[in-house]
Structures are given as C-alpha cells and as structure tokens.
Amino acid sequence: MNLVPTVIEQSSRGERAYDIYSRLLKDRIIMLSGPIEDNMANSIVAQLLFLDAQDSTKDIYLYINSPGGVVTSGMAIYDTMNFIKSDVQTIVIGMAASMASVLVSSGTKGKRFGLPHSTVMIHQPSGGAQGQQTEIQIAAEEILKTRKMINEILAKNSGQSFEQVEQDTERDHYLTAQEAVDYGLLDGVMDSNNLK
C-alpha cells in the first residue's frame, strides 16, 4: 500500500491541501523513487516538461532513489533532461543503481550531487530472450548495442575512458557518494545543505 502524505498550506485566502509531491513540484523538486518503468518515466517526463515551460531559467531538482529498471523508460527521461533548457540538478538519496546511475550522472555538469551515505552502482544491462535461435540472436545483439550506448553515456558523463567504463561495468560496481565524485559521476557530496 502506497500512502502519499498530504500537507496543508495556509495563505491569506485560506487553507489548501496538497499531496506532498504536488507541493514539492511547486518548488521545482521532482522525486524519482522506485523502479524505472514506463508509467514512472511518463510522469517524470511530464514534470520536467511542465517545469521547463513554466520557467526555463530556473533549475529543476531531481532527487533519485532507485534500483534502476527498464532502459527504454530511463532513456525517455535522459533524452528529456537533455532536451529541455532548464538545468537539471540531480541528487542521489539512498541509491542510484543501474539506469538510475545513468540519470544521476546526466544532470547538469557541476550540479550532480549525492547525500553522504548514498550509493551509486553501475553495471551492464541485463536481459533475457527465448524463442527461435534467430530471435535470441537478435535480442543478444540488441543487448550489446544497449550496453555500448550506456557505457558511452557513462564515459561522457564521468570523463573516464570507454574502456575503463566497460571494464568497471562488467560486474556490479558499487560506489559511495565520495567514490562517485572521484570517478566523475557526481560533482559533490551534500551535507546539511553544504558541499564537501
């Protein structure tokens, strides 16, 4: 059961109740939490487009706590982050793993952060196939293309060589927030609204 808290805001015109996510959106904050899939991606994309249309000169704050998920859904968010004019500040809270690590590293350079005890995990995409041999071969080739694309993005975002990223994503590669900064996936560690 997913309960969404409600907040009450008082103004000169009276009281107004918001679900917490709508209230955060007023402050240009988007929460990306849980597995990345089509419905979530559509919601994140819509929020990014709305905030950019509202005022493209102000930053959008994308807080991420996700184990990753469907690559095509994540790429819809990634492409939108790069399409809009607003700078997108990314902040890892908890974990940004798999596709979520690609998103957190794709924030505006200089504005990619992690909280002190957050974790970033990079690895190769996973997938499966069944059916005729030719269908399995097509699926395997698609996974290899996807892996190359993800590794190219991680290399571009981190400043690491493609070969280094390819080696590091061979298996699950966990990084603390500071290690993610050292690797180039993040720009700083946030602590009590201050950067380390």
Swiss-Prot record:
SUPFAM superfamilies: ClpP/crotonase. PROSITE patterns: CLP_PROTEASE_HIS (PS00382), CLP_PROTEASE_SER (PS00381). Keywords: Cytoplasm, Hydrolase, Protease, Serine protease. It catalyses: Hydrolysis of proteins to small peptides in the presence of ATP and magnesium. alpha-casein is the usual test substrate. In the absence of ATP, only oligopeptides shorter than five residues are hydrolyzed (such as succinyl-Leu-Tyr-|-NHMec, and Leu-Tyr-Leu-|-Tyr-Trp, in which cleavage of the -Tyr-|-Leu- and -Tyr-|-Trp bonds also occurs). It holds the Pfam family CLP_protease. GO terms for biological process: protein quality control for misfolded or incompletely synthesized proteins. Its main location: cytoplasm. InterPro entries: ClpP, ClpP/crotonase-like_dom_sf, ClpP/TepA, ClpP_His_AS, ClpP_Ser_AS. It is found in: Cytoplasm. One of its GO terms (cellular component) is endopeptidase Clp complex. Belongs to the peptidase S14 family. Fourteen ClpP subunits assemble into 2 heptameric rings which stack back to back to give a disk-like structure with a central cavity, resembling the structure of eukaryotic proteasomes. Cleaves peptides in various proteins in a process that requires ATP hydrolysis. Has a chymotrypsin-like activity. Plays a major role in the degradation of misfolded proteins. This is ATP-dependent Clp protease proteolytic subunit. It comes from Limosilactobacillus fermentum (strain NBRC 3956 / LMG 18251) (Lactobacillus fermentum).
